[in-house]
Amino acid sequence: MKIQDKQTSPKFTLDDNGYLVTTAKLARIGAMQYLGEEIGKESGKIYDVHVDPDDLFNDATIKSFENMPVTIEHPTEMYVDANNWQELAVGHISNIRKDESGEFLIGDVVVNSPKAIKIIQDGKIEVSCGYDADLVDADGKIKKANIKGNHLAIVNEGRCGDKCKLGDGKP
């Protein structure tokens, strides 16, 4: 039995099946900026939307991201489901958890698609979660609540910047 990983970089491994395996910071607590039209507010205005630890790290949120598909960019349909996953999914995420710093939601990422692996190896490594959430006005702040995961998109520029990316986070 051959048990040897092939390193593509210090942060990415190709397993014996040719799948890219890594860990990623998926999401973070704190404020992120949204245009008003993205969140049902005044168009053209920028709003800070807060994610509190109790909302990001609760059991329901963590479980909702377990085994969700990985995509290249967010789908135009906005969601991945049983009707479109075959065209959109290039891998999956699992072992979703809070990182040691208490700031990030992290997970293990497996990418199966050779085309997607090449895109990652060429440097596209930021990620953005696709999800549903309620926006709640609380103490003069807009915050996300009831976060329910749908997919993880590999993007050029994610909303939480280069803090959320593939190959970042302890395995």
Regions found by a protein language model. Name each.
Residues 53, 59-64, 85-87, 125, ...:
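Acidic low-complexity intrinsically disordered segments
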Residues 8-12, 83-100:
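Short amphipathic beta-strand and strand-loop transition segments with alternating hydrophobic
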